[in-house]
Amino acid sequence: MSTEERPPLGKFGKRSLEKYVFPYLDSSNATMTTPRFGSDYNAVALDDEKVLVVSTDPLAISPQLGWERSGRLALQVITTDVAVSGIAPNYLVANWNLPPTTSDETFEKIWRGFTEEARCSEVQIAGGHTGRYEGSSFPTIGAGTAFGVGKKEDLVPQTPSPGDEIFLLNHLGLEASAIFSFYFPERLSDGTSPSIVAEVKQLFDDLRPTSDLCYLSSLPGVRALHDIAEGGLLGGVQETLASEQGQCGARIVRDSVKVDDRVARICSFLDLDPLKITSIGSGIALVSPDRVNEFIRLVEDKDLPVEEIGEVTASNEISIENEDGTETLTGPIRDEFWARLSEFKGNP
């Protein structure tokens, strides 16, 4: 297979999932949700009242981030996908396929960060597997699965409807900016300033997205909730609306999407659009218009950085209102972060 024919890296897109994955699945009566593109989790009925929510993600560990910090981030990536369901993550299992040269002491540092973050998120590690294997290499060295058990009535409906207001739990662009700051501190300090790089690193270390998303999922009027990862905000909006099979669209007002000044400086230096890059710690909430005031009051009581950025529409298009006109999304969002990171690694 030539380089030109190589499949894209990252998550399977909608077409690949629907053609090569979903046709082979057999959903039982106990499965409350059908696997679909854009879904953060799936739910299984345990009885008439209780539900089990599950989600699996890769375990990604980056030496440049620091072993303990990478462990903390890996835990957050896994648990946030359950947190958006309305059921808090309770348990987790992890499969670590370590590179052959990974020492016990190195893994202990990763594990320390992972387990400390689990305690902060009130998640118990129920089991797993740990070993060294030929062919394994950083960053992707396994996978983790989070479980949450709760009442069916607490599940977020995940049913967007025209007129719903779109709110952003706003740490937009922070993950990508922080990763560059840890990987290339000197180059970013030269392009911005040493204080900006240091402050963005600290902002990233202070993130606690699992508890924030659990809180948002419990609020009245929340009709859908989605964490923002690959594809950024705009990719997240696409995934959030995917359940409606083209029956809903969205209008996003770019000027309403506030980006931290320090993050914006780094994104500008890197020529990255904060709306199109991975942003662990951020989330999208769709709120019924008749509950918006109550939602805002409760968010303000918690002092969360949440902003209204648009609304769900009856069209099947996602439009972004910019200063110089309106842009309509015509296809999947290509996360610009990964390409830029590869460029920087290739041009030290």
For the regions a language model picked out, list residue spans one by one:
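Helix-biased detector of long, well-ordered alpha-helical tracts
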Residues: 1-348
